[in-house]
Amino acid sequence: MAGRERVSDHGEVSMSKHAAVESDEHVAERTAEAARQVERLTRWHDDFPTPGVRFADLTPVFADAEGFRSVIESLAACAPDADLVAGVDARGFLLGAGVAATLGTGVLAVRKGGKLPPPVISREYSLEYGSAALEIPGNGVELRGRRVLLLDDVLATGGTLAAAAHLFVEAGAQVVAAAVVLELEFLGGRARQGDYPLTSILRLP
């Protein structure tokens, strides 16, 4: 994509806001193509990881060159002016790295509890099949004032994404947008999110 580059306060080189923003029509086309790839490649598993849960396996999407490229391009268009991309443990790491490379920003892994050395910023949350915690570094990475694009693979009950967003707010950052590959609308996860824009490539009622 052609455009004028700028250097942020945190050293990332990215495109100027006006040059980087694609037309709404182009973004819609990217999202529609990515949605087709996700629908075609996703595998479904009943009663996994616990009885009554239907698990969406996006591994084939990530392993397919065309599918992965479509997903990354679609997610990157959600917040072209972000200066940090954050991916939620674990498949969000794959998304975060790809989108950060596309936007020319850094990437931060939002880890599950107990995976980072102290100090950490931590938040507990509930899953559709249990509970867990998420963490980000409490020092070593300057987060105050950062413009964060937050990524995860699936939006189900919404607890994971909401907890991740809370971590960055607590650290003094701004979540400028959040995006997921697949949204299970019947679980109502969107209602648990903050006032940041939330994009889903494929939404299943």
Q: What residues fall within each predicted segment?
A:
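PRPP-associated nucleotide enzymes
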Residues: 1-205
